[in-house]
């Protein structure tokens, strides 16, 4: 029994040491043409960039996303299958040492609402912005 507790504690410490520390983990439920706005901030050097996104069409299990990031427009399609459900975007490309990738994951579509998940590792954080 003592060995089980000891190995359990070692396992928990291992998970804590190597676990992912998300600075951004936000679930979004958006209706068609509903706009989500936020400011993405790098806490290590206080840089900020704006993100605006909305979806316009859901057909054949594909969701058409329109996004504006750092005043640059993007349009892409995300699908519900695992291979094509994520769009990754470099946030601060000028910082080579930082792992500053913002991920938008398409989770589900029910009752005319798309469920998306916005993820990024620390030191990135976000604050919502009024549309």
PLM feature spans:
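Generic cytosolic/nucleocytoplasmic N-terminal low-complexity/intrinsically disordered segments
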Residues: 1-2, 15, 106
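Sec-dependent signal peptide recognition
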Residues: 2-10
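Hydrophobic h-region of N-terminal signal peptides that target proteins for export
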Residues: 10-19
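Surface-exposed, beta-sheet-biased, low-hydrophobicity segments with strongly acidic/polar composition
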Residues: 18-131
């Amino acid at each position: 029994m003592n060995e089980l507790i000891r190995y359990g504690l070692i396992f928990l410490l291992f998970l804590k040491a190597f676990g992912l520390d998300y600075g951004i983990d936000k679930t979004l439920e958006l209706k068609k043409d509903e706009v989500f706005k936020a400011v993405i901030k790098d806490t290590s050097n206080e840089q900020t960039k704006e993100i605006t996104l909305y979806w316009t069409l859901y057909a054949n299990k594909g969701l058409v996303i329109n996004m504006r990031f750092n005043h640059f427009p993007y349009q892409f399609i995300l699908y519900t299958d695992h291979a094509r459900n994520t769009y990754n975007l470099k946030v601060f490309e000028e910082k080579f040492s930082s792992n500053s990738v913002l991920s938008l994951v398409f989770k589900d579509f029910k009752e005319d609402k798309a469920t998306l998940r916005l993820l990024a590792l620390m030191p990135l954080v976000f604050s919502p912005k009024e549309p």
